[in-house]
A protein has these predicted regions:
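Positively charged, low-complexity intrinsically disordered leader regions
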Residues: 1-2
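Short alpha-helices
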Residues: 83, 88-158
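N-terminal ordered "arm"
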Residues: 7-60
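Long, contiguous hydrophobic alpha-helical segments, chiefly transmembrane helices and signal peptides
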Residues: 25, 32-33, 37, 67, ...
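C-terminal accessory domains and tails appended to enzymatic cores
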Residues: 6-10, 129-269
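Active-site cofactor/cluster-binding pocket
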Residues: 53-107
Length: 269
């Protein structure tokens, strides 16, 4: 169970069912496994997904959405794990269920970031149990390379502190018993495929992940159609303030102390 002080700082909406809301995912396993948990706990269905190229929807009439593993700009609801502040005084999305947003982690104090998956944060927030097997726990740590911080002497203390705050001390024991090479061997290609309006995950990789995680991975039913085209690119910290004020900004993430990955609306249908 998540540390009470940290839990109380998460937005209230993220702990309860939000009637009439649907999910927006991305094209990777961290997002889809997180959506699977939210579907199991709250019954949410996925209506949209976003890539760096565009935004796709099944039902265009649905207006209320929650991003999953998406660092949405403004005040839009999202579960996320990215650093989204370029400077210590940058605006932050108050509706982001994200440790890094809650603790005001920016590029100014980037080495203090929580470098875990969105999935781990959601599991802790909603008190979802860890996989039953050692192999399942190891695989969980490979998602979004959540294990990596432990193997840096510089980040290890921070990594361990965050794991304790999430209430997953058992995972600290797991990394102590596992080499970095072991994790690399367990890790799979986490990319999903979008083809002919459907979001899919390679059958063998899907079954492998499901067997280790202990639950079925949710995949949305229905035909996705392009709703918007994006312009995605990278820039540096010096342009962070200007970028955060851009009215066309869809999402962004600080990928290092100086680099920013961002996505802007280009064309909306």
């Amino acid at each position: 169970m998540m540390d009470t002080t940290l839990y109380n700082q998460f937005p209230e909406w993220s702990k309860v069912y939000n009637e009439g809301h649907f999910l927006v995912g991305t094209d990777d396993l961290d997002s889809q496994a997180s959506i699977s948990i939210l579907n199991q706990v709250f019954g949410y269905e996925q209506n949209c997904y976003a890539t760096r190229q565009g935004f796709f929807m099944i039902d265009w009439n649905i207006k209320q959405h929650i991003g999953v593993d998406l660092a949405l700009h403004g005040d839009r609801k999202c579960y996320d794990n990215h650093v989204t502040m370029s400077h210590w005084d940058s605006p932050v999305n108050s509706n982001s269920a994200n440790i890094n947003a809650i603790l005001k982690i920016s590029q100014d104090n980037y080495t203090k970031k929580c470098a875990f998956s969105t999935l781990l944060q959601i599991m802790s927030l909603l008190d979802v149990p860890l996989p039953k097997t050692k192999e399942g726990k190891q695989f969980l740590l490979t998602i979004d390379s959540a294990y990596l911080g432990y193997y840096s002497s510089y980040f290890r203390r921070t990594w361990t502190d965050y794991m304790e705050q999430l209430g997953f001390t058992e995972l600290i024991d797991i990394v102590r018993e596992t080499t970095s090479d072991d994790f690399k061997r367990m890790k799979i290609n986490e990319e999903l495929t979008f083809q002919d309006g459907a979001l899919t995950f390679d059958k063998d990789r899907k079954e492998y992940a499901e067997n280790l995680l202990g639950y079925e991975l949710y995949l949305p039913q229905g035909q996705f159609k392009e709703r918007a085209q994006f312009h995605s690119d990278y820039t540096s910290k010096q342009y962070g303030r200007e970028l955060l004020e851009n009215e066309c900004l869809f999402s962004l993430a600080m990928t290092s102390k100086n680099n920013i990955s961002y996505t802007l609306y280009n064309t909306v249908h």
